[in-house]
C-alpha cells in the first residue's frame, strides 16, 4: 500500500525539515516489511487569496487535483478524532488489509481544510486540542508513521 503526505505550504530548510526527512527515511526503510511503501511528500502551494474561505477553497481544489482515484484520504483537522499511536497503526493496517492501493494523509494550510475536503475524508484525525505549527505537525505525522510501522512489526521502538 502506498502512503503519501500532501501538505499545503513549503517547509523551509532547517532543523524541522531535517527531522521530517529523518522520520521519512526511517519509515521508508522499514515500511515494506509490513506491506507499506512511502510514495511522496507532495507540497501544495499556499493560496494568496484575500480571505480565509477563498484560501481554503483554492487549496482544497489543488489538493483534490493530486488525489489518486479510489484512494483513502486521512485529513488532519482540529475537529478530527484523537487516537492512540496503536489505533493509528491499526487504521493503516486495516486499509492495507482491505487492499487499498493509496492512502493520502493531508495537512492543511494556516486556515485549515475547507468543508469539501473534510467531507471527502475517509478519516478525520486530530493531534489533540492544541493548535500546532505546520512544521511541528509534519514532524508529529512522520514520527507517527514510523511508529505505526514499528508497532505493526513488533519493533521495540514503540514500547507497550
From Swiss-Prot:
Coiled coil: none
Subcellular localization, as worded in the UniProt entry: Cytoplasm
Keywords linked to the UniProt accession: Cytoplasm, Methyltransferase, rRNA processing, S-adenosyl-L-methionine, Transferase
GO cellular component: cytoplasm
EC number of the protein: 2.1.1.177
EC class name: transferase
Catalytic activities: pseudouridine(1915) in 23S rRNA + S-adenosyl-L-methionine = N(3)-methylpseudouridine(1915) in 23S rRNA + S-adenosyl-L-homocysteine + H(+)
Residue intervals passing through the bilayer: none
Main location: cytoplasm
List of residues binding S-adenosyl-L-methionine: 76, 108, 127-132
InterPro entries: Alpha/beta_knot_MTases, RlmH-like, tRNA_m1G_MTases_N
Gene Ontology MF annotations: rRNA (pseudouridine-N3-)-methyltransferase activity
Record's function text: Specifically methylates the pseudouridine at position 1915 (m3Psi1915) in 23S rRNA.
Subunit (UniProt): Homodimer.
Family (UniProt): Belongs to the RNA methyltransferase RlmH family.
Protein name per its UniProtKB record: Ribosomal RNA large subunit methyltransferase H
Organism: Bartonella henselae (strain ATCC 49882 / DSM 28221 / CCUG 30454 / Houston 1) (Rochalimaea henselae)
Biological classification of the source: Bacteria, Pseudomonadati, Pseudomonadota, Alphaproteobacteria, Hyphomicrobiales
Gene from which the chain derives: rlmH
Amino acid at each position: 500500500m502506498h502512503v503519501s503526505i500532501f501538505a499545503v505550504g513549503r517547509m523551509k530548510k532547517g532543523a524541522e525539515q531535517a527531522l521530517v526527512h529523518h522520520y521519512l527515511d526511517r519509515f521508508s526503510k522499514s515500511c515494506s516489511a509490513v506491506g507499506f511503501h512511502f510514495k511522496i511528500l507532495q507540497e501544495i502551494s499556499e493560496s494568496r487569496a484575500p480571505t480565509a474561505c477563498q484560501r481554503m477553497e483554492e487549496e482544497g481544489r489543488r489538493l483534490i487535483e493530486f488525489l489518486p482515484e479510489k484512494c483513502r484520504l486521512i485529513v488532519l483537522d482540529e475537529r478530527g478524532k484523537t487516537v492512540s499511536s496503536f489505533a493509528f497503526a491499526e487504521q493503516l493496517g486495516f486499509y492495507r488489509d482491505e487492499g487499498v492501493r493509496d492512502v493520502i494523509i493531508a495537512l492543511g494550510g494556516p486556515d485549515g481544510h475547507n468543508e469539501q475536503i473534510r467531507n471527502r475524508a475517509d478519516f478525520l484525525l486530530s493531534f489533540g486540542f492544541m493548535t500546532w505549527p505546520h512544521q511541528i505537525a509534519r514532524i508529529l505525522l512522520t514520527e507517527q508513521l514510523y511508529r505505526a510501522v514499528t508497532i505493526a512489526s513488533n519493533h521495540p521502538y514503540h514500547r507497550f
